[in-house]
Amino acid sequence: MNEAKTESLTYTLTNNEITNDYKMLGINIDTKLTWEPHINRICNKLSGVLYLLMNLKKVLPDNYLKVAYFGYFHSVIGYGIALWGNSAHTNSVFVLQKRAIRIITGSNIKEHCRPLFIRERILTLTCLYIYDQLLYMWDNQQKYQQRHEIHSHDTRNSNTFSLPKTRLTKSMLNFEYMAIKIANKIPEKMFKLPKPVFKTKITDWLLDKAYYKIDEFFNEERNY
């Protein structure tokens, strides 16, 4: 069967309206899992937050402005990011995050933001995604097999988690696949640490990195 030429037809005996996306637990899920409707909704909300930050900038010192940022902006982009954080549409969210940090720091529109993220100790969107995925893997590490549990002979990086076999790009981008792939880029010993220590070390490391793209993380020779 040629999947590229296959069309689907939905049959129903009810009068319920068929929609291309629906909202569940605050997350907009579309039928093609592009996450575009959810990201568009986030951007609309964040645009309002930027307006709020600009007004607060006039009356609040920077430390209180950062509190407002974490309460109204950071909390929005962090919600459910493990699901949508690797979407092709996330750049529109990151553009707004860079505008937010320029407002907080009083920087001009042409100011490079990476040093600002590092100085202000604010996780970039990509770093927030990586953090969330690593935290998921720490919580669920017993659920996934490590390579030494599958192969009887020694293999390179035998203590890393085994990736599921998949050929479809959409499958390779799903959140579990990406979580394992991200986890395999940091030393296995990190997952032996107590959770509070793990969270602190991962956070400090990501704050110093300020990745803009997930490819920056994967292309580094040694991430941690």
Regions found by a protein language model. Give the residues of each.
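Extended, well-ordered alpha-helical segments in internal regulatory regions
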Residues: 72-87, 128-141, 181-183
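Amphipathic alpha-helical
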Residues: 139-178
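Basic, alpha-helical interaction scaffolds
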Residues: 18-82
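Short, conserved micro-motifs composed of acidic
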Residues: 1-22
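Charged boundary/loop elements
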Residues: 78-90, 94, 173-224
